[in-house]
Amino acid sequence: MTETNKGVERHLLASNADLFARREQAVARGVGNMHKLFVERARNAEVWDVEGKRYIDFAGGIGVLNTGHCHPKILAAVEEQMRRFTHTCFQVVLYESYIELAERLNALAPGDATKKTLFLTSGAEAVENAIKIARAYTGRPGVIAFNGGYHGRTLMTLGLTGKVAPYKIGFGPFPGEIYHAPFPIEVHGITVE
């Protein structure tokens, strides 16, 4: 059975294998996938694939779903916001809820110094901005990153990533002044001394 929506055919009874074959034809190879299953729905800490198999979600959107999938309070808040407006680029259109959340986070941050918040759309964007802020504040260009760490897919964050395969092969040269060091784990014989 199929359903057509503006020229795109959607298979209502597709299998994971069928969808992965379509993925191979339509999606760039640079987008890696850890699993070959396609999620159809999710609730709390469980996901169901398109074949109806249930799984426990140990990935949680790589750490961004600490409330679980489809939490009722999150759904209600999103629905309320969507009814008001959906534009989210604060640099173009200002809105009070951005400031309210920044104030709440600033109040939670430790220490007596003045706090300010910057919201970004991805981890890579956050890392790149942290590097820019640190370089501007210190006047020093050097950055230390730990071996084995993963920081993102932009050129700067790939340079910081401490694992060559599969992330960095064929993408250099990377930005300069990035130095890699082993992460201090005493059980591995590496200490902070």
For every predicted segment, state its role.
Residues 2-43, 93:
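Active-site-adjacent loop/helix segments that line or gate small-molecule/cofactor pockets in enzymes
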Residues 27-35, 61-63, 70, 84-88, ...:
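Glycine-rich, flexible loop/turn motifs
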Residues 11-13, 54-140:
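Glycine-rich loop-to-alpha-helix module at the N-terminal edge of alpha/beta enzyme cores
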Residues 48-49, 67-68, 159-161:
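Short beta-strand-to-turn element immediately C-terminal to the catalytic PLP-Schiff-base lysine
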Residues 1, 52, 143:
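Conserved S/T- and glycine-rich ATP-binding loop of Class I adenylate-forming
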Residues 36-59:
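Active-site and channel-lining beta-strand-loop segments
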Residues 7-11, 66, 93, 159, ...:
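A general boundary/transition motif marking the beginning of the first structured unit of a protein
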Residues 103-193:
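PLP-dependent aspartate aminotransferase-fold enzymes
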